[in-house]
Amino acid sequence: MSVVSAITVTVPATTANLGPGFDCIGAALKLYNEFRFTRLEEGGLIIHVSGTEAERVQTDESNLLYQAFVKFYQHIEQTPPTVKIEIKLGVPLARGLGSSATAIVGGLVAANQLEGATLSQSQVMELAIAMEGHPDNVVPALLGGCRLAATSGTAWEICDVPWHKDVVPVVAIPNFELSTSEARGVLPTEVSRADAIFNTAHLGLLLRGLETGNGQWLKTALQDKLHQPYRKALIPSYDAVNIAAVSAGAYGMVISGAGPTLLALADQLHSEAVEAAMLAAWQEEGITAEVRSLSLDTQGAKSF
């Protein structure tokens, strides 16, 4: 491929961990950020932002999207071109839906496409994981679908996790934020053998439940002892929303990524009732939230 003058990249939101799959599993959702990069012959960096919470996005060289763009050129040992970047935000910031992953993947993919696809998808993925520090958001953001990532220490193995068509992700996005650093700060530095075994078994069951749509397996699988017991205290009325979701027919509810968005899994028959129940539970506590059922994105980052 030849060098091009402009490129647009769309990157999906992601939900990570899915309960027991802490830092190793995530799924792409049909909710997107769009980034357009245009080469400039002169002048300096220009960043325009529109959409969800646009005023909160940095428009200088500290912008994460731009930092990822520059990272690509550092990797190939070239000077990055001067660009105008137009950002259309659809993924809420700092809500546990992978907004930072969209920026990292978007910047790397855009740079790679501007330079004629110099790097393979696997190489782009390795750069994205290195920037993010963990694979569970950037991998599905890049590749789409539900993905499990494991490393031997030198390379990553990525596994596509089949997701049954009758398993519906329902996200409840509150009007408050929770930073990833704060959510990681409450985690213990060591866990017991019993808790490690618990999560290993439940992750295995989760994978089979997602593949088959077996509701009983999912009800059991969506439990965790490594991160959610510590993080849920940072999310007001977590228990009330959980009870409401399950009472309305959800298989279970988990924290999406680092939170504060909550993710319930339900079947097609109960998804609307689960939406309404989660919304009402937070409203009763005076918390405004957007609750919606989303489909799985199977394509990942796209450029045109």
Swiss-Prot record:
Pathway stated in the Swiss-Prot or TrEMBL entry: Amino-acid biosynthesis; L-threonine biosynthesis; L-threonine from L-aspartate: step 4/5
GO cellular component terms given for this protein: cytoplasm
Gene Ontology biological-process entries: threonine biosynthetic process
GO MF term set: ATP binding; homoserine kinase activity
Subcellular location: Cytoplasm
The reaction(s) this protein catalyses: L-homoserine + ATP = O-phospho-L-homoserine + ADP + H(+)
Residues binding ATP: 92-102
UniProt KW Cytoplasm keyword: yes
SUPFAM superfamilies, A to Z: GHMP Kinase, C-terminal domain (SSF55060), Ribosomal protein S5 domain 2-like (SSF54211)
Keywords: Amino-acid biosynthesis, ATP-binding, Cytoplasm, Kinase, Nucleotide-binding, Threonine biosynthesis, Transferase
EC number from the UniProt entry: 2.7.1.39
Family: Belongs to the GHMP kinase family. Homoserine kinase subfamily.
Entry-linked HAMAP family: Homoser_kinase
Role noted for this protein: Catalyzes the ATP-dependent phosphorylation of L-homoserine to L-homoserine phosphate.
PANTHER family (alphabetical): HOMOSERINE KINASE, HOMOSERINE/4-DIPHOSPHOCYTIDYL-2-C-METHYL-D-ERYTHRITOL KINASE
Protein name: Homoserine kinase
Organism: Nostoc punctiforme (strain ATCC 29133 / PCC 73102)
Gene: thrB
